[in-house]
Amino acid sequence: MFDQNEFHKYATKHIGLSSMHLNGYIESSLTPYIIEERQMNMTQMDVFSRLMMDRIIFLGTGINDQVANIINAQLLFLESVDPKKDIQIYLNSPGGGVYAGLGIYDTMQYISPDVATICTGMAASMGAVLLCAGAHGKRTALRHSRVMIHQPLGGAQGQASDIEITTREILKLKKELYDIIAHHSKQDYEKVSHDSDRDYWMTSEEAKTYGMVDEVLVRKAK
């Protein structure tokens, strides 16, 4: 049985997350509390914990270091609970920090359970990378969701040598991201590079054709 306090202990003591940041993320991201009734017993818990009971992670915000640390802690915790049972990540994200997003991506690939991804609303930029990185055959999008890929954004200032160093790093990141998308979508690298030169928006059906998702969901299977 999932204990909502166990994840908090795992994240703060084992992973080293700030308790203040973790509580703030939980309280700001989702409806605070629900009442769960089972076999004549009633308990109050936050939606964050209730979803975790069903091995569901909800990423509904921009991706930064704080968010990535919490998502990674959830993935690692759920693997420790059951290394064979699937984990689902629901995505409605405009993207965000590339380094933070790549940290989530690497954790998704590293852990034993399959990670299914579901786009609800929008998966743009780094969000699109995470969407397509789900386990093959388990990447889905709701009917009216949107997926967008583009080249990483960045800027530099200072001495010419500093600008050159930053430029080289951005080019490395761009190649890494395009390689990831090409690998999971089965598209040619050149096509991904060409399409990502500017914002490339896709409907859910177009994302399926492109290889970003495997299925478009209209109604949840009974």
Language-model features: locations:
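Terminal-region recognition feature
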Residues: 1-222
